[in-house]
Amino acid sequence: MIVKSANAQLREFYGVQFQVLAIGQNSMVCKMLYRKTDSVPAHAHPNEQSGYVISGKYKLKFGNNNQILEAGDSYAIPENVEHSFEILEAGEVVDVFTPIRQDYL
């Protein structure tokens, strides 16, 4: 699957806008477009989530982790682990979900 940036559809979940950039057999790549007013409450899903911060500043909480993330930082959250994401400064994050998040389609 190839998605040209001009063709990436804007979607929304928890009030956060995002684009699905690619869907493979077992994983998907999304670009999250966080606004300062966005908030991702504590939740869990059956997908492993790995992310890379392109821009912005965030507070990520999961397990015993409570970290501030900025451009260049990355993270991995195991499946079924409750986590939350507080937006401190607007920006973009690339997230990879394995398996594919059906609720994002």
Sequence positions of predicted segments:
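A cytosolic small-molecule/anion-sensing beta-strand core signal
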Residues: 54-55, 70, 89
